[in-house]
Amino acid sequence: MTVLSVDLASRRYRDNGIALLRGRWGHARCEILSADALGLDGEPDAQTFAALLHDVAVREGARLILLDGPQGWRAEQSALVHQRRCERESLAPGKTGLPGVVKPATWTRMALFSIALFDALHAHGWPRITAAWNGERAAIESFPTQAWRSLGVPAMPGRASTPSVDPWRAHLAALGVHDVPSTVTHDEVQAVVAALVGLQLLGAGFSAVDARGCDPHRDGEHWREGWILSPRR
């Protein structure tokens, strides 16, 4: 079983952490893919990035693509004002409200890019996952902070507050993830921990994972709501 995971960045391709995880829950091997090695440079473009992720996933036999970023907007009928249900249940700091409304406002670029990337992946045959998922290809919204929490591990702080990722490399090893290189970056570690839910899904199904939110749905021009999925220990 193979999954492809991205800790997403919208300003520079090189800031994206990209990881392949192969194996099964409790015993997996990691491969880090650098933007440079993939021929990516400059400012990310959703269509270009989606096409490349599709090509990598097909070549490597991955059935799931995970992105650390929002997949849609808040539903019109939601009782929540500023965020989607999955963000509320995951205590996510970034919040997507009605179309175009993002909190904090400085996160708007990232939110728009992420939603556009989910849309582009959908066009390549990677629809947003639903609770009725039955093993087919799908795109999944991840949240590494929630992944660490649901595994019972202290979440890794932001890049500027993390002088060394070695403690979290050790946590990954204890979870059965092998071949995480000593040169791994903060964003790559986050991509790896987020990927674990993909192996759990492929091995045991939707009911086995930590699922926050509700099924995504299309409302006019926009996708709304969606699941944030994390591994469950």
Language-model features, listed with the residues they occupy:
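RNase H-like (RuvC/DEDD) metal-dependent nuclease/polynucleotide-processing core
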Residues: M1-L4, L8-R233
